[in-house]
């Protein structure tokens, strides 16, 4: 029991306090990994175009202008999106209703551009479905240490329950064999 209390205390220490900056703050988003920000990366060190054209974004352009242009494209796509796409319940703004598929399609080929504040907001509000994206969201929300602690506690609890079940089953079958033998 003492171990569980200590683990709970460590978990509470790992969670961010209300005064700390949220990982969803656009300034912090610059340091997020591409998977957490729903931004697809290059495959085999070559840029991948998702805009259905062979024209890749020129690296000489201003990164702010690129970010604003991309944000404008995303907003236009969000306005035209079918109502069947899922949104998170807390997404009330148009930017939050974007899907990853649309973001991937609209993403410029030059993936190393420094995104603007508005572009970061769009990427962060990108809606991704599936267990893998939910795991990344959980890590982003609670931190890697806390999620690792959750998993360790869960696995330990599962092992203890299985050990108890096995010992109970072994005792009951062992007594049954002795009774039959006597």
Swiss-Prot record:
The chain crosses the membrane at residues 144-164. Pfam families: US6. Residues 165-182 are cytoplasmic. Glycans are attached at residue 51. GO terms for biological process: symbiont-mediated suppression of host antigen processing and presentation. Residues 30-130 form the Ig-like H-type domain. Residues 20-143 are lumenal. It is found in: Host endoplasmic reticulum membrane. InterPro entries: US6 (IPR035129). Inhibits peptide loading of MHC class I molecules by transporters associated with antigen processing (TAP). Does not prevent peptide binding to TAP, but binds to the lumenal side of the TAP complex and inhibits peptide translocation by specifically blocking ATP-binding to TAP1, but not TAP2. Also prevents the conformational rearrangement of TAP induced by peptide binding. In consequence, infected cells are masked for immune recognition by cytotoxic T-lymphocytes. The ER-lumenal domain is responsible for TAP inhibition. It is sufficient to inhibit ATP binding to TAP. Interacts with UL18. This is Unique short US6 glycoprotein. It comes from Human cytomegalovirus (strain Merlin) (HHV-5). The lineage of its organism: Viruses, Duplodnaviria, Heunggongvirae, Peploviricota, Herviviricetes. The gene is US6.
């Amino acid at each position: 029991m003492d171990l569980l209390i200590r683990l709970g205390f460590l978990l509470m220490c790992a969670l961010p306090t209300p005064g700390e900056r949220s990982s969803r703050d656009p300034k912090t988003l610059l340091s997020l990994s591409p998977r957490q920000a729903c931004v697809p990366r290059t495959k085999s060190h070559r840029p991948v175009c998702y805009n259905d054209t062979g024209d890749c974004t020129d690296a000489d352009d201003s990164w702010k202008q690129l970010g604003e242009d991309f944000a404008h494209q995303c907003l236009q796509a969000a306005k035209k999106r079918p109502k069947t796409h899922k949104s998170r319940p807390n997404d009330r703004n148009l930017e939050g209703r974007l899907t990853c598929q649309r973001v991937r399609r609209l993403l410029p080929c030059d993936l190393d551009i420094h995104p603007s504040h508005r572009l970061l907001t769009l990427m962060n509000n990108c809606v991704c479905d599936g267990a893998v994206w939910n795991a990344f969201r959980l890590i982003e929300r609670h931190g890697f240490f806390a999620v690792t602690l959750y998993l360790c506690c869960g696995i330990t609890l599962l092992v203890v329950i299985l050990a108890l079940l096995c010992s109970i089953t072994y005792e009951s079958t062992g007594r049954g064999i002795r009774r039959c033998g006597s």
